[in-house]
Amino acid sequence: MTQSLVISIDAMGGDHGPSVVVPAAARAARDLPHVRFLLHGDEAAVRAEVARCAGLAERTEVRHADRVIGMDEKPAQALRRGKGTSMWGAVEAIREGDAHVAVSAGNTGALMAISKLILRMSADLDRPALVASIPHAKGVTTFLDVGANVDCDAERLVEFAIMGEAYHRAAHGVAKPTVGLLNVGSEEMKGHEEVREANRILREGGFDLEYRGFVEGDDLTKGSVDVVVTDGFTGNVALKAMEGAARFMYGELRAALTAGPFSSLGALLARPSLLRFRERMSPPPAAPLLGLNGLVLKCHGGAGDREFAKAIRAAADVAQSGFASEIERNMRRLPAALSPAAPSPADGAA
């Protein structure tokens, strides 16, 4: 982009607040010369951090927020007291046209509720979904929902498939992404009622999707399909299990390579490769909330400045991807696919 891109950031969100968020903005700014920042939070604290980062002040506007939404607040509480908080300000800047995309490391449920209230849903969608990018040998798998919606009926899963396919097409340049529905087996009769009904709708609904049916957990890292769809409960558990496994493997590998003098010498020689391995296995820096009339990304609450800088770079990429129009085009087919006149599930599917 030749014109300036504005990223609105909740500077108080997450476990560390401005002491991490502001240096992260400075780190990301070095790679994003066309980006400006709106930082929302306690003005004195944020400005003090900005002053420590050379060159950041010229590209940053600080907007004062009196309050912060706690990481343990319920979404209903966050909505009641949201105005005047740093998270509210970061999202509201999108609606007001002051920024192109918002980033927060704050409370996930609160961010979803506030974003939905302020920005509203697009194209008759019901709920936003959090999406993650899972690395595999051939590229990445787009995985959703990873925590925004614990309970999902068949219609929600179909919406997620449409959103995920459009996102993968725009974000990763794949002309016709393949889509799979996460299940406990690939057979048609497997799984609970909601996932079987979603499978039927996706097969018979006339969507412009390359739908491949059910996939299993190991398909996430095999690259069997481009997009894997599930409910937020299952997705969040799977994502965190993969993150934990990656940390365990890296720790064990590092311990084995430093167990003795000769292996330590080998570890020193292998250090660049080990760092690349750790980078490759690191969890995604941020998860976009898909389906809103505006772009919002959720960063890990415990992210350090390096991880938050990655989230900011991801926000810049998403803001330039243009996937919203792809979602809207396929959503027009959804009401007909959900019609009672549509064929019923095959007999014996249990």
Curated annotation (Swiss-Prot):
EC class (word): transferase
Keyword Glycoprotein: no
Gene3D superfamilies linked to this entry: Isopropylmalate Dehydrogenase
Pfam families registered for this protein in UniProt: FA_synthesis
Keyword Transferase belongs to the record: yes
GO molecular function: phosphate:acyl-[acyl carrier protein] acyltransferase activity
Recorded catalytic activity of this chain's protein: a fatty acyl-[ACP] + phosphate = an acyl phosphate + holo-[ACP]
GO biological process, one term: fatty acid biosynthetic process
Keywords: Cytoplasm, Lipid biosynthesis, Lipid metabolism, Phospholipid biosynthesis, Phospholipid metabolism, Transferase
Function noted in UniProt: Catalyzes the reversible formation of acyl-phosphate (acyl-PO(4)) from acyl-[acyl-carrier-protein] (acyl-ACP). This enzyme utilizes acyl-ACP as fatty acyl donor, but not acyl-CoA.
Subunit structure: Homodimer. Probably interacts with PlsY.
HAMAP family: PlsX
Protein name, UniProt field: Phosphate acyltransferase
